[in-house]
Amino acid sequence: LLKIPFYEKDWVVVGATKEELIGKGYKQIGKEFPVFLHPETKEEYALARKERKTGTGHKAFSFEFDKSVSLEEDLERRDITINAIAQDKKGNLIDPFKGQEDLKNKIIRRVSDAFKEDPLRVLRIARFAAKLNGHGFKVDEDTMEEIQKIVSSGELTTLSRERIWMETYKALTTDNPEVYFQVIEECGALSQICPVSQLDTSFLAKAMKTQTDPNVRWTCLVASNSSLEDINNSFNVPKEYVEISEVCSLIIAFKKLDSVNVKDIIELADKTDIYRKEERFLKAEKISNFCIDNNSNQNLNWNEIVKLINNIKASSDLKEGKLIAKKLREDRLNAIQLYLSES
């Protein structure tokens, strides 16, 4: 309805049983609740269901799948009204919660009181706000109040770090990922996920205009933060993201120095392991340019410096390890000194 490209269809089946679908050749794939693959199209078909909260957390629900469950009852358990619009095979829209009206008014609104039962919806609301920001959508006040209540209840702490990262990663792939972090900050969720209550999204906002790689975007968000290690750990980011953000953080600190000398360059090379991780360093260095003022007084060509450093090989005339390392370091220092004097 928003003309946003979609790549799959999910079907809700009313008035049927698991046995009936299996008898028609559908293959069950869902464990928590029955989801089936169509024998030909491989599209997903789920039995209409009702849910009941049984405890705390994202997975503390029991499900009811009998034939009496209506489509409206199934849609009532959805998170937001624009996600609670169904379409039958003839193209007719079923919209019991005025989702089309909210589409027209560009509002992200919860469907019902059942919304508050699932803490994951805090992050989902933030992600939808990021995804739909470019279309002018905003989270309505009542829904924002509800996610603040979920945060205050403490249930957000029951979410696994893996699930938190899954939603965060999806947000990083949207056109306005900074909105995701602004929403979780505003509702108080950020400080429950990690040991900071604020994240500076300005560098992320600057990078997202040209950079679509989620790793680049994440690094722009966190590399300048003094709690980098704790943030990476709290969001359960992949190892590659951790490494790039940590290297970028070191480069940013280096670029903020008023002046640098040869030893500073070698020290940075040592800390970032340029010798074995050349590509990682160069990627992080490019990202760092989004995270530092343009008036940095350093004008170093890191592609040339890295190439220069790594072209220097250990002397074959020396046999003792310590002597080899010392000579290699001296050669690198001399080469960089010569390069700087000629630049």
What spans do the regions from the language model cover?
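Catalytic cores of the polymerase beta-like nucleotidyltransferase superfamily
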Residues: L1-S343
